[in-house]
């Protein structure tokens, strides 16, 4: 296989970092992954020990890589008081004025809940402080790209799912109780989801096509837009026996949030489940090509079957 180049994944232990690294390695890149500890070795990936608090560590991890996947993230309740912006600034500094390409995972927080078709040219009008933070961080990347310091490519996606994730919507909510499916919204409300193996391949595809793109790009990954009813049906299809169905107890999450800061922040984003916000991008669809995404039932079966193993 021809070597496509070298990529560094900052935050290799995170869900996005792992799947992006796997996709780049499978596509023929030399892959480095940086984190404080090598929690899960990935075939074809060189681990580099480093701390995201250290510009020097990140600069060393980036080295001669042409592409950097910024998969760093902070705990959900630690985004505030300038922490996320400071992390973004450190990565920009570590990139230097080299013209290298950064690929950055965006999300839907930037947009008003009333928006139904969320396209790249849609106005960014965040509903919550968390969305305002994301808007500021993306502007920092755009400013660095406009200055000519680097190329910045944002790939925006919905909620993640994949086999064997911990701390995700299935592990913590939808399938947290044995024998029960907790529907996160009314059954007729759609939601944007991203199957992480597909999203990882999309990161690689954009990196490979980077020379055909502008200095700053904002892409929206359509993934799978499905209603909670369709989600429940896909889980039932993959389950070894029929599961009871109930509504996710958002009121309970709110009460837990009085004592648990992470749950408090999760509940603040409840509005995303009450509004069908569909990510759309015909330009990205053309780059990725037809039939890019894993079929929904297949992706869901792979994701949920481990929950039923041995049952």
What are these regions (language model features)?
Residues 174-194, 198, 205, 212-214:
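A conserved pocket-lining segment of Rossmann-fold NAD(P)-dependent short-chain dehydrogenase/reductase
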Residues 88-135, 153:
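Conserved Rossmann-fold NAD(P)-dependent oxidoreductase catalytic core, especially the SDR/UDP-sugar
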Residues 38-98:
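NAD(P)H-binding glycine-rich loop region in Rossmannoid oxidoreductase-like domains
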Residues 130, 158-165, 185-197, 207, ...:
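Glycine-rich "substrate-gating" loop/helix at the edge of Rossmann-like oxidoreductase active sites
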Residues 1-6, 202-266, 286, 293-311:
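Mid/C-terminal beta-alpha module of Rossmann-like enzyme folds, strongest
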Residues 5-26:
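N-terminal Rossmann NAD(P)H-binding glycine-rich loop of SDR-like oxidoreductase domains
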Residues 10, 34, 71, 104-107, ...:
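SDR active-site strand-loop-helix element
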Residues 107, 139-163:
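Conserved beta-loop-beta element that borders a ligand/cofactor-binding pocket
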């Amino acid at each position: 296989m021809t070597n496509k180049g070298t990529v560094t994944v900052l935050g290799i232990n995170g869900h996005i970092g792992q799947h992006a690294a796997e996709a780049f390695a499978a596509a023929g890149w030399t892959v480095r992954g940086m984190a404080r500890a090598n929690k899960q070795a990935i075939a074809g990936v060189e681990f580099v020990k480093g701390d995201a608090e250290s510009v020097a560590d990140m600069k060393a991890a980036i080295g001669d890589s042409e592409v950097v996947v910024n998969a760093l993230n902070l705990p959900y309740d630690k985004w505030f008081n300038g922490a996320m912006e400071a992390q973004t600034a450190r990565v920009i500094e570590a990139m230097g004025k080299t013209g290298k390409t950064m690929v950055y995972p965006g999300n839907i927080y930037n947009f008003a809940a009333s928006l139904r078709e969320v396209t790249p040219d849609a106005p960014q009008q965040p509903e919550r402080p968390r969305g305002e933070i994301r808007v500021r961080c993306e502007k920092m990347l755009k400013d660095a790209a406009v200055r000519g310091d680097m190329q910045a490519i944002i790939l925006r996606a919905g909620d993640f799912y994949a086999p064997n994730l911990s701390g995700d919507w299935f592990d913590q909510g939808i399938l947290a109780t044995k024998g029960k499916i907790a529907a996160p919204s009314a059954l007729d409300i759609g939601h944007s989801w991203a199957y992480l193996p597909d999203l990882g391949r999309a990161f690689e595809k954009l990196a490979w096509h980077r020379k055909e793109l502008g200095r700053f790009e904002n892409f929206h990954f359509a993934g799978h837009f499905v209603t909670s009813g369709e989600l429940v049906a896909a889980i039932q299809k993959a389950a070894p026996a029929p599961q009871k169905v109930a509504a996710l107890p958002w009121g309970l999450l709110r009460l837990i949030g009085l004592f648990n800061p992470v749950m408090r922040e999760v509940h603040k984003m409840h509005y995303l489940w009450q509004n069908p916000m569909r990510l759309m991008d015909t330009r990205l669809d053309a780059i990725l090509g037809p039939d890019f995404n894993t079929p929904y039932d297949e992706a869901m079966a792979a994701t949920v079957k481990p929950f039923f193993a041995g049952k």
